[in-house]
Each structure stands twice: as structure tokens, then as C-alpha cells.
């Protein structure tokens, strides 16, 4: 039995080694057409069916449709760009409800983009996207359309808040114009959701919306942010020298992709021995970089990569780019106008809870209309990904159902966010969704759970290999 389980666990890796899907960097679809600069932000520049089936933890999922859209947007400086967003239609979809899910891509290479990593047959390097896809399955089971944008944009600007938030909003604009092929209503309700790196994009989208996309306020019913990345400097301080140290070179390269002068400055300050791993951070996806560089010290310790230590980040060229990307550094103009849920583990080992606390207090002091903080006393960053998901799903369901959100601010602590109100159905949906994805059940409401298709789940994986 153990041998069978081991073999089944290897099947996704075996399949990925046998199939080749075109990386984003080699796919012309990602390149905007001539003259795209004149298009409006949120316009659809290109459209195609997903080149391959989508997968959840490397098992192909059965959905009615999946499209890729190339969407017009702009970078942090107002320069036009274009990014890909993936739109998924479940069976028996409700055209009035869409979840915009921002993945924790956390990488500075376009070949780590969710539009590529979510495809069946994507390489093992994109495993974090495949894990993240397990969170997309429950909304699909509920009949919600799901859109997941490559919010880091064509330059893969991990940790760059404005680019990430704007792309998230332009993705929403695009899908609200997609009715001719997707069936989505122009006045559809949209819930934003993201965890960890995805919370950075989601939080910035909620903050930028009143200024960047004011017309979307009538559509966006709320934003759920978990493992809330409000302060990127504090995250670097938290992970330097720990098993998660590889996050640092990913984030620094992401910032440097948006600020070219920053990359030159980083290399001038790097110790010679650290240059190869800094370059690797520009190529690796999240899991690979974490695996290769645990316990490395970049700003602390006697053999740190940057001799100046944390003092380096106080120098003008570094400090400005970092300050530009601190959500907590925005002024009151960017107070979210939609309900917000923050869910976070008290003992989060990557994103210290003091920073989500500070962001919560700031927004409350500014008079936010609805802000709920669900603190989980028992979990760290990784565990809260999954124990907090049912709370986010229950909260999103309530927003779609038109239930009145928290008025003003509310901060609650629980032993676990699995005890969040009305999570029994969403917890069941989450774990049943994993089961159904593995065994190939079509995703959508009113679907017979025994209706397994040969092209999806475990059977689809085996048949593809055979």
C-alpha cells in the first residue's frame, strides 16, 4: 500500500517530465500588439482558451471553460504594459459572482506566473501555484467564476505594490467586459482574495481602488487578505537567516525589475560570494529559492551578503523604492472603501503580526467603514494558509449573499480560525474540493459527485502518462 501511495505521489512529476508546455517567456501571447498603448486600462488585447487544462496540485481539474486574457494596464510609473489573467468558468456558473484570487507567486521571473504555473503539465518549479490552486477549487464548486491575474506584470515585479494592485483592478475591469464569451454580467459582484504574496496585491488593490478604479466600487463587495503583507521591510527582517531567507533575493530582484537603477546599486553593494545566489533569485520560483538558500544571511551576521547590513536600506536609492511599496506608508486618500477581512496567525514566522495590527489600527483611525481582523492564536504562516481559508470563504459567501458586514472595526481572537462563524460549510467545501479535484469530479453546484470524467483528476493524469 505504501508503495502504491508513493507511486501515485510521483505521477505528477512523471507527467511533467514527459510533457512540455510553452513557458511564458517564450509565448508570443504575452506580448501586446502594436499600438496597444492607446487602449484603456482593463481593455482585453488578446483572448484564447487556456493552452492546456488547468490543474490543482498537478491533478487536472474539470471545469466548463478556462480562458487567458491579455489585459492593458500600466506599471508603477504610469507606463503602459500588458499582463495575462486567467478566467475560469465552473459548471452551472452564476454570472453575477466572481472571485478574483491573487496567488502567492512570490517570484521575479515571468515563468513563475500563475497563468503558466496553473496549467496541467507545468514544471515542479511552479509547485506553489499548484498548491494555491487548491484554494481556487471551493469557489468554483460554489458556482463562482474565478479570475487569477499575473499581477506582477510582464517584468515580474514581486513586492511592488502599485503594479500588483493596479493589475488586479485592471483584471477585474477586463472580466466585467468579457460577457460576450464568458457570460459574466457587466454588473457582477466581485470579491478580492489573496494570501501572503497574494495579500500584497489584494491589499494594494483595495487601497488603490478609490483613486485608480473608482467605477469598480459598485462591483467589488469586499477584499479578504490573509497572512497580510503590509510591510515588506519587516518581512525581510523576520526571515533573514531563517529557513525562509530565500524570500529576500526574490523580493529584491522583484523590486529591481521595476527600478532598474536599484539592480545596479544592489550588485555594487553585494559581497562577491553572494552574487550567484542573487542572480539565482532572478531565475528561481518561490519553492526552489527557499529550498536552496535556507539560513542565509543578507543583512545580519558576520558573513552577510551586504556588508552595510540594514543600514543599506536607509540610503536614498534603496529607501525610496522600499517606501514607495509600503502599504502602510500610503496616505488617507487610499483608505479602502469596500469591506475588508484580515486573517492572520499570531505566531506567523514570516510576516510578524505586529504589522497587520498596525495596518488595521491605521485604517480604523482613518474611519474605515468595515474592517474585520480574525486572529488565529495557534497558527503560523504556512498553517494559516489552509486553516484560515474556510474563514475567508465564509466571509466571501456572506458578501455575495448581501449580508451586512462588520460596521466599523472588529478584532477577534480565536484558538483557530476554523472556529470562525459559519465555517462548517466552507471547511467541508475546501476539503471536499481537494478530493474532487484529485478524482476528477466536474466542479460546480448541482453536479453529481460520482460523475468522474476520464480526462480529469487521477484518471486524467494516468491516461495522459499512458
Swiss-Prot record:
Disulfide bonds join 112-285, 364-409. It is an enzyme of class 3 (hydrolase). Its main location: secreted. It is found in: Secreted. GO terms for cellular component: extracellular region. Induction: Expression is not induced in medium containing Tween 40 as the sole source of carbon. Expression is up-regulated during the yeast-to-hyphal transition. Expressed in alimentary tract but not oral tissue, during mouse oral infection. Pfam families: LIP (PF03583). Residues 1-16 form the signal peptide. The active site is at residues 196, 348, 381. GO terms for biological process: lipid catabolic process. Belongs to the AB hydrolase superfamily. Lipase family. Class Lip subfamily. Secreted lipase that is able to hydrolyze both the neutral triacylglycerols and the monopalmitate ester Tween 40, allowing the use of hydrolyzed products as carbon sources. Has broad lipolytic activity, which may be important for colonization and subsequent infection, therefore contributing to the persistence and virulence in human tissue. My be important for alimentary tract colonization, but not oral infection. Facilitates invasive disease via lipid-based suppression of the IL-17 response. This is Lipase 2.
Amino acid at each position: 500500500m505504501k508503495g502504491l501511495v508513493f507511486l501515485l505521489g510521483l505521477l505528477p512529476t512523471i507527467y511533467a517530465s514527459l510533457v512540455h508546455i510553452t513557458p511564458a517567456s517564450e509565448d508570443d501571447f504575452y506580448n501586446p500588439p502594436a499600438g496597444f498603448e492607446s487602449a484603456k486600462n482593463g481593455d482585453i488585447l488578446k483572448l484564447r482558451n487556456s493552452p492546456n487544462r488547468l490543474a490543482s496540485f498537478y491533478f487536472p481539474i474539470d471545469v466548463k471553460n478556462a480562458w487567458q486574457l491579455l489585459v492593458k494596464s500600466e506599471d508603477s510609473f504610469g507606463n503602459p504594459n500588458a499582463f495575462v489573467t486567467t478566467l475560469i468558468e465552473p459548471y452551472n456558473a452564476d454570472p453575477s459572482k466572481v472571485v478574483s484570487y491573487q496567488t502567492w507567486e512570490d517570484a521575479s521571473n515571468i515563468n513563475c506566473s500563475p497563468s503558466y504555473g496553473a496549467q496541467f503539465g507545468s514544471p515542479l518549479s511552479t509547485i506553489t501555484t499548484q498548491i494555491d490552486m487548491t484554494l481556487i477549487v471551493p469557489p468554483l464548486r460554489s458556482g463562482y467564476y474565478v479570475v487569477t491575474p499575473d499581477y506582477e506584470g510582464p517584468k515580474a515585479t514581486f513586492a511592488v505594490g502599485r503594479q500588483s494592485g493596479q493589475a488586479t483592478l485592471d483584471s477585474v475591469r477586463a472580466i466585467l467586459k468579457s460577457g460576450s464569451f464568458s457570460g459574466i454580467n457587466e454588473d457582477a459582484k466581485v470579491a478580492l482574495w489573496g494570501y501572503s504574496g497574494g495579500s500584497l496585491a489584494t491589499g494594494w488593490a483595495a487601497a488603490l481602488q478609490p483613486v485608480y478604479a473608482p467605477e469598480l466600487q459598485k462591483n467589488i463587495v469586499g477584499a479578504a487578505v490573509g497572512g497580510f503583507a503590509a510591510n515588506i521591510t519587516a518581512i525581510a527582517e523576520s526571515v533573514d537567516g531563517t529557513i525562509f531567507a530565500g524570500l529576500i533575493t526574490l523580493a529584491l530582484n522583484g523590486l529591481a525589475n521595476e527600478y532598474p537603477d536599484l539592480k545596479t546599486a544592489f550588485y555594487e553593494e553585494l559581497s562577491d560570494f553572494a552574487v550567484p545566489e542573487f542572480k539565482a533569485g532572478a531565475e528561481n520560483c518561490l519553492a526552489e529559492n527557499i529550498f536552496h538558500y535556507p539560513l542565509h544571511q543578507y543583512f545580519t551576521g558576520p558573513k552577510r551578503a551586504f556588508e552595510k547590513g540594514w543600514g543599506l536600506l536607509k540610503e536614498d536609492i534603496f529607501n525610496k523604492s522600499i517606501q514607495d511599496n509600503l502599504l502602510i506608508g500610503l496616505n488617507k486618500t487610499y483608505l479602502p472603501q469596500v469591506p475588508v477581512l484580515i486573517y492572520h496567525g499570531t505566531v506567523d514566522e514570516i510576516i510578524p503580526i505586529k504589522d497587520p495590527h498596525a495596518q488595521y489600527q491605521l485604517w480604523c483611525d482613518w474611519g474605515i467603514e468595515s474592517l474585520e481582523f480574525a486572529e488565529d492564536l495557534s497558527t503560523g504562516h504556512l498553517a494559516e494558509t489552509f486553516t484560515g481559508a474556510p474563514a475567508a470563504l465564509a466571509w466571501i459567501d456572506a458578501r455575495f449573499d448581501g449580508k451586512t458586514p462588520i460596521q466599523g472595526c472588529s478584532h477577534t481572537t480565536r484558538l483557530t480560525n476554523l472556529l470562525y462563524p459559519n465555517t462548517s460549510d466552507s471547511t467541508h467545501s475546501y476539503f471536499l474540493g481537494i478530493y474532487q479535484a484529485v478524482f476528477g469530479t466536474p466542479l460546480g453546484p448541482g453536479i453529481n459527485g460520482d460523475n468522474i470524467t476520464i480526462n480529469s483528476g487521477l484518471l486524467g493524469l494516468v491516461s495522459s502518462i499512458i
